[in-house]
Amino acid sequence: MAQHFKDLVAWQKAMDMVTEIYKLTDSFPKREVYSLTDQIRRAAVSVPSNIAEGQAHYSHREFRHFLRHSAGSLAELETQLLLAERLGYADHPSTEGSLQRVHEVGRILNGLIASLPE
């Protein structure tokens, strides 16, 4: 296992994703600041946060548990991004780039989960 969560590619890519999500949601309507914008940002932040928390437990079982929470947050984030596009808060090219990042993090996360011994 990595010495520190910052060494994990999954965490690094998730942090990049959060930065991208914050930039995307900056253009959302102000009336959504405490609603969809907040939900999207929380879901995004949850991904690297759970990776870090899980790695800090030093147990493969607990690490896997927190990684699965991260995967759940990715599904939540994907749904919310699609909703934002449907509502006209972001155009397809903008959400498509963010969704590609979400899928990339998901693939890396699934690989990390699969690599952990039972």
Please state what every model-predicted region is:
Residues 1-118:
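Short, C-terminally biased terminal segments at protein or domain edges
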